[in-house]
Amino acid sequence: MGDYIVKATAYEDNVLAFAALSKDTVNRAKEIHSLTPTACAALGRSLTAVAMMRTMMKGEKDKVTLVIKGDGPIGSIVVVSNFPGIVKGYVGNPFVDLPLSEKGKLDVGRAVGKKGYVTVIKDIGLKEPYIGTVEIQTGEIGDDIAYYFYTSEQIPSAVGLGVLVGKEGDVLTAGGFILQLLPDVKEEVILKLEKAIGQITSVTDLLRQGKTPEDILTSIFEEEEVKFLEKIPLKYECDCSQERFESAILALGKEEIQKLIKEEQGIETVCHFCGKKYFITRERLEELLKEAEN
């Protein structure tokens, strides 16, 4: 079974729900970045969350970026989704290795840190993107994204994210859910949802049991009718290219390109998201300079 996201409603369309299975997606990220288990859990949770957040957006060309910058040893976490069901990301320190937490879990909160900021950038094709920034709450990522939704978008939300890493470092399972109250919801629905969320042990436990995204939502809402609206395949994929790299060089302007021509025989860069290397020769830099001058 491949990775995918489901979108649904519950409580007579008063709650919007998303759930994802992201095992292969997270495993691909682990392979690309040589992630330790702790770094894998941190990036995996973030990838899963952003994949669901992109599903909330309506435009085909809409983009969402999540940046988590805490004071922990993992450094920054950056995840981008430019298309529905396609994500990419990286962490500042993929080799961070910490002891298990007091609960015997991978200590993502300590890796991320308790001080810092969560920033969400949504580009829906307007002149300026929407940028929302909130303080990190726990560093566990799920709590922090729920706090972002409530504080920055005024949407009460519950976010559950999980990544289970085996003893050999392989990703055994990964996934999560996001539940959001729609406007003007009745108090009784809020109480029902709070009770349902309170009964969830952990997303990882549900995934370990082999629950699908549909199963996860059905188990959360129990006897309530869940209307499944959409199913979207999910994968890790980078859309970098030589053209994009050259466009970034052009954006530097004439003076900077002239400096590069004087100081370098050529430029090599590595994509943060997939590790692919790109090279621009001195001759190509001179061509780009002519374009910049025109």
From Swiss-Prot:
It is found in: Cytoplasm. GO terms for biological process: protein refolding. SUPFAM superfamilies: Hsp33 domain, HSP33 redox switch-like. Pfam families: HSP33. GO terms for molecular function: protein folding chaperone; unfolded protein binding. HAMAP family: HslO (MF_00117). PANTHER family: 33 KDA CHAPERONIN (PTHR30111:SF1). This is 33 kDa chaperonin. The gene is hslO.
